[in-house]
Amino acid sequence: MLRTSIASSRQVLSSPICPNPSVQWLHTSRARRVNAAASRRYYAVARKPNAGVRSSSTPNAAATPELSQKATNSTSTKPPGPNDPDVRSPASPSTGSTLHPETVSKPPQSPAVQGQTSPGSSVQPPEHEPSPPPPRPPPAPKTGLLRKLLYLFLTTGLAYAGGVWYSLRSDNFYDFFTEYIPYGEEAVLYLEERDFRSRFPSIARQINRRVSAPRDEGAQVMIPGRSGLSWKVAEEQQEASDVTKQGQHISATDANELTEETKVAEKAKEDVKSKPVAKKAEAAEPKSSPKVVEPHPAKAEENTSLEAPRQPVVPAAAAIEHLGLDNEDEPVVQDLVKVFNDIITVISADESASKFSVPIAKAKEELEKIGDRIVALKNDAQESAKEEIRNAQAALDKSAAELVRHINEVRAQDAAEFREEFESEREKISKSYQEKVTTELQRAHEVAEQRLRNELVEQAIELNRKFLADVKTLVENEREGRLSKLAELTANVAELERLTAGWSDVIDINLRTQQLQVAVDSVRTTLENSEVPRPFIRELAAVKELASNDEVVAAAIASISPTAYQRGIPSPAQLVDRFRRVASEVRKASLLPENAGITSHAASLVLSKVMLKKQGTPVGNDVESILTRTENLLEEGNFDEAAREMNSLQGWAKLLSKDWLADVRRVLEVKQALEVIETEARLRCLQVE
């Protein structure tokens, strides 16, 4: 016997009816687990005790039937669904709630549940399921420090690169960037140097190729602290004349000696300026030994009051030659040589000029190298300028050729468009002219017919007038002649009536004949100009209506098959094209006997591939000869003989060409009927004449 566990039902009944809203979701999950446990069923070994007997071993035996009944009701009741209106949806748990399923107190179990269900029952009480493990704590939110650092680095790099780029465009921003941003000036200078090297690669290569020679400093020269130029103009103080010092007022020989020394120095300066420019190798070498300016000895005069002047112990310094370069045509080199020569002049005027001879020589060499380098840079610049001029000239020639080609293309395109417009206009004019000519011809034809009718009417009126005049004359004559010529007058009247009726019949016959001819021409034009089989019922009905009283025309129309004028007939070109397709199939079946099978068909198909096609006008009754003769006749336009040749085929060949023969017969029938109708129309014209 199946029954529900009492312990499970007690767990269900132990849950509160109205749970706390804050922990409602916990009770809902627990209720689901309890319902799942309650749905389990067990087999009972012993019989169920009577409801009225109270067990002495259970202290709460009176409540046992009620609990079992409630458990039965709870198990038999359908579990609440999600759409049940009596069941409230669980409230969302608050984030601040710290309740856990394991912290909720369980109701105490009754002693009846702890022991057996009855004294004689051997069923063990159901074991309680272990409580579910506590949920995992929510993972800590990621701080994203590495991502922020990466974004900060990228943003800083982009801002720095943008600042460097904008510094190359704006001078104000350049000052701000290089002053307040670290390493800003180095970055901007590096980019400017790269830009300069990309613009002038030849100058950059020459700068890289230059070998810096070690500089010879020479001996150290000590310069006094207050020597050289100063920003403040020194005030020259005129010293008071000292009569105790040596001078002209004491000795006249010293003044003469000083005058001679001054003249020698000025003469040396003029000699240096008048000398030609020395070569580079000679300018680097030290010059010859300096000339010692010896003062002219003064006259030996015995002077008892003053001593004779002494000879100079140290010889005078040699004058340093000025710098001379071959490329003095450059303004920069000229200024540099001029400044350097002024410096040499100043040094030469000093007594210690010999100390500066070696540095001056080295400076000359460096200046010569600088001059050569300037010339080389100028030559390179000229070569690069020439190369750019040649490239510009080539680009100009290329663009000119491209422009000429484009102009030629545009001209050719315009000519083609003009030609197309001319052709279209010519076609329009030709078409309009043809329409105009057709209209004029139609109008002329109508005018001619109307004129003919008018002439006939005038003739009839004139005849009637003559007739009346004749009648009047005859009547008068009869009156005068007492009706002697009454019989002759009656005969003349009858003749005139007959002639008038005859002329009317002639006109009607001519009109009908012309209309019949036009209708026949319309049928023939429709058949000849149609590219596909086209019905010609209306044209044939017009012919039949115009020749309704002509038995010959009616018989010719009746001889035409209804299929021919209802569906149309193929043109000669279509017949020839279809014959070629039919001929290929007939050749495949040309070797088949009358009662041929699949093998015979296959053999005939294979052998037809190797058969030679005949040319010319072959003689014979074989299939190939008949097909060749038929094709020649079709090319000549003789469809009647071609149909006769194809009709002479036998067996499968004739069966395959049956449809083509039917089309040819219909074409020949229509052609023959049209010829008969045209002949009849001509015959009627001859009869009228």
Swiss-Prot record:
It is found in: Mitochondrion inner membrane. Component of the MICOS complex, a large protein complex of the mitochondrial inner membrane that plays crucial roles in the maintenance of crista junctions, inner membrane architecture, and formation of contact sites to the outer membrane. Plays a role in keeping cristae membranes connected to the inner boundary membrane. Also promotes protein import via the mitochondrial intermembrane space assembly (MIA) pathway. GO terms for biological process: cristae formation. Its main location: mitochondrion. Component of the mitochondrial contact site and cristae organizing system (MICOS) complex. Residues 169-689 are mitochondrial intermembrane. Residues 360-505 form a coiled coil. It holds the Pfam family Mitofilin. It comes from Blastomyces gilchristii (strain SLH14081). Residues 53-78, 91-100, 111-124, 240-256 have a biased composition (Polar residues). The chain crosses the membrane at residues 149-168. Residues 49-142, 234-308 are annotated as: Disordered. One of its GO terms (cellular component) is MICOS complex. It is a single-pass membrane protein. Residues 56-148 are mitochondrial matrix. It comes from the Eukaryota. This is MICOS complex subunit MIC60. Keywords: Coiled coil, Membrane, Mitochondrion, Mitochondrion inner membrane, Transit peptide, Transmembrane, Transmembrane helix. The lineage of its organism: Eukaryota, Fungi, Dikarya, Ascomycota, Pezizomycotina. Residues 260-285, 293-302 have a biased composition (Basic and acidic residues). Belongs to the MICOS complex subunit Mic60 family. InterPro entries: MIC60. Residues 1-43 form a transit peptide.
